[in-house]
Amino acid sequence: KVLSEILDESDRRPDRWLGPSVDPLTRFLWARAPLAWPQMATYALYRLECGLRSSAVLGFIGLPTLGFQLDTFFRQGEYGAAGAVMAIYITLIATVRLWMRPRLLLGWLIFAAVMLATVRTPPMGQGALWRFLSQDIIPAPLRQGDPAALLPWLWELTTTAILPGLAATLIVAQLALVLAGAVAFVAQAAIVPRVTGRVGAGLGHLVLVILRSFPEYMLAYLFLQVWGPSMLPAILALGLHNGAIIGHLLGRQATGLTLRADAPRGLTLWGWEIVPRLFGPFVALCLYRWEIIIRESAIMGILGIATLGFYLDDAIGELRIDRAVVILAATGLVTVGIDALSRAIRARLGAGDLHVGDARPGAVPGQATNC
C-alpha cells in the first residue's frame, strides 16, 4: 500500500517522455521504479524498525523479548535494570543502518532461517483449535440453543462495550493525529543540515531515534507512571511516536532533495522550499498513520484506557471469546472505514499530484532531453 503511494508521489514526467509505444513493464523498470527506489529503500528499513518494536511489544504478553524483560523489571521495581534494557533497545534501533546493509542482507536471511529451524512448535491441547472454531467463537445465545436472544445479546454488547470503546478510541486517535502532524511538521526540518546545521541535525536525529525507538505501548506505560490512568498518556505516546516516524521519513526525503546552487539556508529554506515540495508526502504519510493510530489507540485499552482494547481485554480475561471476536470485528470495520476515508481525503486534496521532483524547463513529453 505504501509502496504504491510512493510510486504515485514520484515524478511522472520521465514516464511521459518515453512516449506511448513503450510497454508498461519497461516504463516501470526504467521510468518509475528508479525515481521511487530511494524512498522505497528508506521505507523498507523503517519497516524493519517496526518489526523490532513489535517484537518488543510482544514481550508484554509473554514472549521472551526485550519488552518482557522491561515489563518484568518494572513490576519488580528494578528501575536501574529497566533503564539498561531501554538503553540497549535504543542502541539497537539507532545502529540499524550499520548492521543492516544491503550486502549483509543475504547473511541475515540465512541466519534467520537457521534460527527458525531450531524453534519447535509449542504443544497445544488436543482439539484446542477445533474447540476454538466450533465453540468458543460462537455467540453464547447460539451455543445455548436460543437464536431469539442473539439480537438482544448483540445490542447489549454494542451499547455497553463497542460504542463507548469506539468513542474513546476516536477521541484518542484524533487528538494523537493532530499532535503527530504538529511534531512531524517541525521534525522534518530538524534533521536537515542546511536548515539546522550539522550539530542541530545530529541532535534532531538523536531525539527522533529515541521517540521512534520506543513503541507507543512502552511510551504510554512510562507516561502512566507520571500522569496516572487517563487518555493523556496514550495521546502523548501516540502523537510523539508517530510524529517522530513521519518527521524522520520526511527529513530523509528533504535531505535528498536536489536544490539550486543559490538555495537559501535555515528557516527560509524550510518554509519556502522544503515544506511546499514535501507537502504531498506529508499529507499521504499523515493519512496513512491515521489508520495505524486508530488501531494503536484501541490497543491502548490494555493499559486501562477505556478504548476498544479495554473491552477486548476484559472479554478475553473472562474467557468470553465470542464477545472478543465481535469487538475485534468492530475494530476491523472501523479501520477499513478510516482507510477508505483517508483515501478519499487524499484524493480530494490532490496529495497524489504533488510530486517531489525537479523542474526541467523546456522539457516536452515524449521527446528525449539533455538530462
For the regions a language model picked out, list residue spans one by one:
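Transmembrane alpha-helix boundary and packing residues in multipass membrane permease domains
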Residues: 43, 55-59, 68, 189, ...
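Hydrophobic alpha-helical transmembrane segments of polytopic membrane proteins
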Residues: 65-101, 309-344
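Cytoplasmic-entry segments and transmembrane alpha-helices of multi-pass inner-membrane transporters
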Residues: 1-7, 186-222, 248, 252, ...
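Transmembrane alpha-helices
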Residues: 2, 24-57, 83-84, 91, ...
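Hydrophobic alpha-helical elements at and bordering transmembrane segments
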Residues: 48, 70, 162, 166, ...
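Short helix-to-coil transition segments within interhelical loops
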Residues: 9-36, 63, 257-278, 305
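Loop-to-helix entry region at the N-terminal start of transmembrane alpha-helices
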Residues: 1, 160-173, 212-247, 279-281
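N-terminal, non-cleaved signal-anchor transmembrane helix
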Residues: 89-205, 350-371
